[in-house]
């Protein structure tokens, strides 16, 4: 039996579960109850409630355990595991921005084989199974068309110029400077999952993520690949749950951005 024949019914079940979670997502917009600090990040009561609801429903319906952003779960390299971000773009969500989403990926032995991204405030619901196509609101989409970096929008992760870590702020500024010399159409949406699904949908021509959280990436990686795009880390290695960054785009744009990144030097030099 082909993998897609196993996965497609799971995606159908998961879609109904995310539809059911949408009401709670909408009610909590502009939520201001930060319940836990995680560096500069936080969760709201709505994050926790959505994760509890979706996890319980997924396990009951599919028999597959869930690794969630807020409560964790089984290892992401398990035979089968759902990976959930109940609200991607939590700061946007709490501030009242519509750029927030529910992200759900299905991993098989650590490989994203399905992705679902729900954007309740603007209506799009995206799904895909490995091999494609991308499906938007129930309608199959054409494969991604390739393009030139100079002609497309590029999503870039948000940051502080004074931040440290694996990708210091000064390195990220260097990335922006180099990219802007080729494309003046850089965008910061404050949601990795939205950046990735926008690449899959052809809204963005590329996206750079300086983060390594699997729940931010699993769904979008599946969607981009299903649409015909490429997703690697910033060094050009295929994205895996252990990756600490991501670069997504159609093949030509991906290669052009990767060449620019290679010209900047190593992050630790900054």
UniProtKB/Swiss-Prot annotation:
Q: Which residues bind substrate?
A: 69, 87-90, 187, 216
In the induction comment, the record states:
When comparing gene expression levels of the four IMPase family genes in exponential cultures of M.tuberculosis, the level of cysQ is the highest, almost equal to sigA; impA and impC are expressed at approximately 40% of this level, while suhB is lowest, at 12% of the cysQ level.
Give GO MF terms, alphabetically. Answer: inositol monophosphate 1-phosphatase activity; metal ion binding
Q: What happens when the gene is disrupted?
A: Strains lacking this gene show no difference in colony morphology and no differences in levels of phosphatidylinosotol mannosides (PIMs), lipomannan (LM), lipoarabinomannan (LAM) or mycothiol (in the absence of exogenous inositol).
* Keywords from the UniProt entry: Hydrolase, Magnesium, Metal-binding
InterPro entries, per database record:
Inositol_monophosphatase-like, Inositol_monophosphatase_CS
Pathways involved: Polyol metabolism; myo-inositol biosynthesis; myo-inositol from D-glucose 6-phosphate: step 2/2
- The positions annotated for binding Mg(2+) 1 are 69, 85, 87
Which enzyme type, at the first EC level?
Answer: hydrolase
In terms of superkingdom, the source organism counts as Bacteria
Q: Known EC number(s)? A: 3.1.3.25
Q: Which reaction does it catalyse?
A: a myo-inositol phosphate + H2O = myo-inositol + phosphate
Return the Pfam families for the record.
Answer: Inositol_P
Binding site residues for Mg(2+) 2? 85, 88, 216
GO BP terms: inositol biosynthetic process; inositol metabolic process; phosphatidylinositol phosphate biosynthetic process; signal transduction
Cofactor(s) of this protein:
Mg(2+)
User: Which is one Gene Ontology cellular component term of this protein?
Assistant: plasma membrane
Described function: Catalyzes the dephosphorylation of inositol 1-phosphate (I-1-P) to yield free myo-inositol, a key metabolite in mycobacteria.
Q: Which PANTHER family match?
A: INOSITOL MONOPHOSPHATASE (PTHR20854), INOSITOL-1-MONOPHOSPHATASE-RELATED (PTHR20854:SF4)
Q: What family does this chain come from, according to its entry? A: Belongs to the inositol monophosphatase superfamily.
Protein name per its UniProtKB record: Probable inositol 1-monophosphatase ImpA
Q: Which organism does this record belong to?
A: Mycobacterium tuberculosis (strain ATCC 25618 / H37Rv)
């Amino acid at each position: 039996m082909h993998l897609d024949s196993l996965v497609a019914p799971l995606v159908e079940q998961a879609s109904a579960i995310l539809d059911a979670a949408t009401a709670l997502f909408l009610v909590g917009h502009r939520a201001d109850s930060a319940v836990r600090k995680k560096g500069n990040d936080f969760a709201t009561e709505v994050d926790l409630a959505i994760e509890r609801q979706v996890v319980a429903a997924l396990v009951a319906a599919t028999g597959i355990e869930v690794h969630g952003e807020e409560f964790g779960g089984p290892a992401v390299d398990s035979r089968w595991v759902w990976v959930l971000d109940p609200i991607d773009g939590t700061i946007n969500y709490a501030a009242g921005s519509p750029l927030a989403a529910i992200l759900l990926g299905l991993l098989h032995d650590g490989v994203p084989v399905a992705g679902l991204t729900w954007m309740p405030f603007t209506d799009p619901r995206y799904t895909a199974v490995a091999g494609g196509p991308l499906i938007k609101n129930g309608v199959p989409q054409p494969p991604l068309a390739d393009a030139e970096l100079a002609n497309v929008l590029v999503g870039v992760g948000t940051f502080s110029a004074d931040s440290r870590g694996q990708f210091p702020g000064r390195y990220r500024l260097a990335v922006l400077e180099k990219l802007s010399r080729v494309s003046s159409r850089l965008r910061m949406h404050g949601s990795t999952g939205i950046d990735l699904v926008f690449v899959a949908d052809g809204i963005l021509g590329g996206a750079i993520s300086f983060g390594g959280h699997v729940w931010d990436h699993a769904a979008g990686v599946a969607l981009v690949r299903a649409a015909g795009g490429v997703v690697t880390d910033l060094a050009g290695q295929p994205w895996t749950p252990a990756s600490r960054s991501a670069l997504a785009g159609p093949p030509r744009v991906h290669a052009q951005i990767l060449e620019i990144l290679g010209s900047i030097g190593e992050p630790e030099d900054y």
